[in-house]
């Protein structure tokens, strides 16, 4: 089969590799119909080279059709259309039962001191071959695969693999309630969807903050108010809200970007959040999504929620059966470009770490 492989820092190639096969009776093989480049993939492109081996298959956002299933797999069968979540979990351990699938005790990479195994994401997370390929082996398939309806564009469901549950969860952690004004800092793929999820969860107004004109325009088209290039973002948000500020703030700039200055500005946007509260939060709560605290800092009404790998939920129980989330998947489809798998390298070179702006679904070439 053809697959996108890591060959060194800033070097990926589409190569011929062996087809995957069942390794356990709980596995399934999925023929990939669409996959996507995630912002996390760009960490592999440059930063996480020490944890990759030449030839590793990349990708952790994919969907397709089940073509083979192990004897213990009963929930899906060949011919089913499925989405493959980023994290690999058993669904039955203590962590999974509490919605912390990315800390699954069965697939946890204990030797590395990390959480559950992840598709296409370095030796730190199990070196599991990823989904930017024509076929992928899915462990714990009964729990890991999300059946979706046949027909329609893949992009209608593809984002359920990672980005949409992440955005939905951010809005949930912000405790968005009807009538709220929500500020979203960073309108990249996750931030854009988090803003739209906040609207679907009842926010009366959502104000998005970014510097990229294309992102601001896409947000406007989705009914999101925007704040662009300004010397004083908190002042701009305060002006839009009559001096009251936002009720909830979602920070989605990510670990590559501006760091503490953005977070400091974000804290200043929150309604009535005094410096004696905001400064200790900024000093003691990490903001990188790979190091944010799994707990919650609570000082009276203001609260900082950390979203680290231990709290990032899959689109599964309880979210898998959340009809509103599935409705959001319908609303999210259709964005980004759709080059074939063979053009993955060019897409990375064109995007770069600081220029990637939109999701990019990938479609393996049609069979002859």
Where do the model's predicted regions map?
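Glycine-rich beta-strand-centered segment in the early N-terminal region that forms part
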Residues: 18-35, 48-97, 101-102, 129, ...
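Cysteine-cluster motifs in flexible loop/terminal segments that predominantly coordinate metals
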Residues: 38, 86-150
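Cytochrome P450 core scaffold surrounding the K-helix E-X-X-R motif
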Residues: 39-45
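Mid-domain Rossmann-like dinucleotide-binding core that forms the NAD(H)/NADP(H) cofactor-binding site
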Residues: 81-82, 134-135, 143-231, 235, ...
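Residues in the short beta-alpha loop(s) of Rossmann-like NAD(P)-binding domains
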Residues: 212, 312, 337
């Amino acid at each position: 089969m053809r697959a996108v492989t890591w060959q060194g820092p800033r070097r990926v190639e589409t190569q011929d590799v062996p087809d995957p096969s069942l390794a356990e009776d709980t596995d399934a093989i999925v023929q990939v119909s669409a996959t996507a480049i995630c912002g996390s993939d760009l960490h592999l492109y440059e930063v996480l080279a020490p944890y990759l081996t030449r030839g590793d298959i990349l990708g952790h956002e994919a969907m397709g059709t089940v073509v083979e299933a192990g004897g213990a797999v009963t929930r899906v069968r060949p011919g089913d259309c499925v989405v493959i979540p980023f994290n690999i979990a058993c669904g039955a351990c203590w962590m999974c039962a509490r919605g912390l699938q990315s800390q699954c005790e069965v697939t946890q990479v204990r030797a590395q001191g990390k959480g559950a195994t992840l598709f296409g994401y370095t030796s730190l997370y199990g070196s599991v071959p990823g989904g930017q390929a024509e076929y992928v082996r899915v462990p714990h398939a009964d729990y890991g695969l999300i059946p979706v309806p046949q027909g329609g564009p893949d992009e209608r469901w593809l984002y359920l693999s990672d980005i949409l549950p992440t955005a939905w969860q951010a809005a949930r952690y912000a405790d968005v309630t009807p009538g709220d004004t929500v500020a979203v800092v960073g309108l990249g793929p996750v931030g854009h969807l988090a803003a739209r999820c906040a609207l679907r969860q009842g926010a009366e107004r959502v104000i998005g903050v970014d510097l990229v004109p294309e992102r601001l325009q896409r947000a406007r088209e989705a009914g999101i108010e925007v704040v662009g290039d300004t010397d004083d973002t908190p002042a701009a948000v305060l002006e839009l809200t009559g001096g009251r500020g936002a009720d909830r703030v979602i920070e989605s700039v990510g670990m590559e970007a501006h760091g503490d200055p953005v977070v400091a500005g974000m804290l200043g946007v929150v309604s009535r959040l005094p410096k004696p509260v905001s400064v200790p939060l900024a000093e003691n709560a990490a903001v990188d999504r790979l190091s944010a605290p799994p707990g919650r800092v609570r000082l009276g009404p203001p609260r900082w929620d950390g979203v680290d790998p231990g709290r990032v939920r899959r689109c599964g129980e309880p979210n898998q059966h959340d009809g509103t989330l599935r409705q959001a998947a319908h609303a999210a489809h259709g964005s980004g470009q759709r080059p074939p798998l063979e053009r993955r390298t060019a897409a990375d070179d064109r995007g770069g770490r600081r220029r990637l702006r939109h999701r990019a679904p990938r479609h393996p070439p049609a069979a002859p």
